[in-house]
Amino acid sequence: QKTPGPQRGTDMKKKILILISILIILIQIYLLSVLAISALYPISHINEEDLSYLRQKTKGINHLMIVAHPDDESIWGGAHLLEEDYLVVCLTNGSCQAREQEFQAALEQTGDVGIILNYPDKILGLRSGWRFQRKSVIQDLEKILSLKQWDTVATHNQDGEYGHIQHRLTHSPALRAFD
């Protein structure tokens, strides 16, 4: 026995609503998972041993560059690195050995010193907004800024060059820590 026309349309609408509801629930579960993992993401903060190492490595270096990712120092600040000696602090990708090696090799070529912190770049495929790490980013940058009186502090612009979220997020704490 066939369902009458108007009834069939109502059944179809119910099925579509159920599918949409299931999809929304799955998206929410995924986003909550990202938030949970982000909150639990292991961060090793700058400690006294790191600061001692940086004090030793930056003797005679009075310029500081703070970037979000390895290669940002070359793309956005390459001219600075060629003109002066810099300590370059990179906030993300401390867990990616290949990027760290490329970063260190680039700095060797320009005679600069660098450190990569391990703030998350992506979590479960989504760009991290450092929601749970912002306070830690500021604290780590404050420690680095307090190492000495820097002649120059260079970082991403407030627009993140082309709107990149982590470039913008690097700009804000760098300025807050510098104030």
Regions found by a protein language model. Name each.
Residues 145, 149-159:
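Proline-aspartate-enriched helix->loop->beta-strand connector
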Residues 158, 162-178:
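Catalytic domains of cell-wall/extracellular-matrix polysaccharide-remodeling enzymes
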Residues 66-70, 156, 165:
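Short His-Asn-centered micro-motif
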Residues 15-19, 27-148, 175-176:
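Active-site rim/loop-helix segments in enzyme catalytic domains that contact anionic ligands
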